[in-house]
Amino acid sequence: MNNLVKLTISQAISGLKNKEFTATDLVTAHINQMDKYRCINAYITEIPELALQAAKKSDFLIQTNQARPIEGIPVSIKDLFCTKGILTTAASKMLQNFTPVYDATVYSKIINAGGIMLGKGNMDEFAMGSANINSYFGNVINPWKAENDDIDLTPGGSSGGSSAAVAAFMAMAALGSDTGGSVRQPASYTGTVGIKPSYGRCSRWGMIAFSCSLDQAGIITRTVEDAAIMLETMMGYDEKDSTSLNVEVPNLRSAVNQPIKGMKIGIPYDLMENKSLSSEIITMWQNTINLLKDHGVEIVSISLPYINYALPVYYVLSSAEASSNLARYDGVRYGLRVEGKNSNINEIYELSRSEGFGAEVKRRIMMGTYALASTNINSYYIKAQQVRRLIVNDFTNSFNKVDCILIPSAPTAAFPLNSNQDDPVTMYLNDILTIPASLAGLPCISIPAGFSANKLPLGMQVIGSRLDEYNIIKISSAIEKALNLKFIPKGF
């Protein structure tokens, strides 16, 4: 029964339909896997009893021919999404005892489609981080190890628990969030598939806010087809979210295994000169370009001059929005309450926020508050918004010539957990390749496309024009099929 955890979602759906095994069997196998690899720390909260109850319901619906689209599929839910009656912490001491009274819309969509939650995935606190070292509940460990080395590696962030759970076969899919790359970069580090849809495709209702103009739900799976299946269940208009788009949900699964001959793929060749990119990443990029050429794709050189400013623009805007969003956690309205000797209101604010937030969250709040100060707002926040528009224009101009854009997902393979912890700028550079598409609100997917010299997975990123999730699935599926590589951590 342990082999059940190795199935893809499409295989599991078929097996359940054909009565080869039950949803209870499938969930039990994943619970056993979670028990075996708890040292990875992929989950903050586990709910095996509730998962088994849900599995019994799924078995009944399957037996009575009432199965929903993803009936019986075990999933991990990032601990940023509200789950009624189940602890939701955002990996912060500030919310360590918070139990929501309602469900996030995107979580409801997954459950209503038949998905079964196994638990709440670990993450960087309030989704701020690129290495999953900022969780109040401890680091997540990447299931992958470098060849001939036993050093613990980062699973990426902020959805590190999500990516680790999928890579270690502790969930078939994991709901994550992507603000500046928090689904795609972890997917790259763990040999999984991570997709972020266009901004507004998935509801943000019930997703604890970090940066409202950038936050978007995403999904991590082990294949492109599985990502398409899951994303279809998540997308759709939600009147409770003012940024939700009232547009038709495409049939993404139909994009899998479609011919790509004649499509045009844009390559920003100038980016290959960026010193942050390792030689292994550039080699993988060039190999993927050659593979696409062999399949009849036209490669077009494009220019994205303003993406060199994407990183500072992102950290000004996201920190400013975080400063505003996190102001509510003061120990009086929301969050951990710490009272001092005097118990006056200012002391409660100061002590609660000092003790409730971790170092990285405090750093970004301070950066954001500085950028929004009346003496600084024109120089920082307003200027960043103006440059963001130039970045959007770069992409718009490029998509007048091409169907998709191909760039790597991360500048390197996964790095040791204990490296660069005291160097926030170096940490921020890990998102240099994912942030541009986030600023433009574009759909993008990271797929595993090669290995480093140390046998660690490397990811490629396909970026589409606004609302064109179909073509990024189409291209990434073709790359996945042509490469035909297996991405399974040693020992799993």
From Swiss-Prot:
Keyword presence, Lyase: no
Catalytic activities: L-glutamyl-tRNA(Gln) + L-glutamine + ATP + H2O = L-glutaminyl-tRNA(Gln) + L-glutamate + ADP + phosphate + H(+)
Active-site positions on this chain: K78 (charge relay system), S158 (charge relay system), S182 (acyl-ester intermediate)
GO biological process: one example: translation
One matching Pfam family: Amidase
Enzyme Commission number(s) from the entry: 6.3.5.7
Keywords, sorted A to Z: ATP-binding, Ligase, Nucleotide-binding, Protein biosynthesis
Keyword Translocase included in the entry's annotation: no
GO cellular component terms, semicolon-separated: glutamyl-tRNA(Gln) amidotransferase complex
Gene Ontology molecular-function annotations: ATP binding; glutaminyl-tRNA synthase (glutamine-hydrolyzing) activity
InterPro entries assigned to the protein according to its UniProt record, in alphabetical order: Amidase, Amidase_CS, Amidase_dom, AS_sf, GatA
Cross-referenced Gene3D superfamilies: Amidase signature (AS) domain (3.90.1300.10)
Record function comment: Allows the formation of correctly charged Gln-tRNA(Gln) through the transamidation of misacylated Glu-tRNA(Gln) in organisms which lack glutaminyl-tRNA synthetase. The reaction takes place in the presence of glutamine and ATP through an activated gamma-phospho-Glu-tRNA(Gln).
Family: Belongs to the amidase family. GatA subfamily.
NCBIfam families: gatA
Assembly notes: Heterotrimer of A, B and C subunits.
Name this polypeptide is given: Glutamyl-tRNA(Gln) amidotransferase subunit A
Organism of this sequence: Orientia tsutsugamushi (strain Ikeda) (Rickettsia tsutsugamushi)
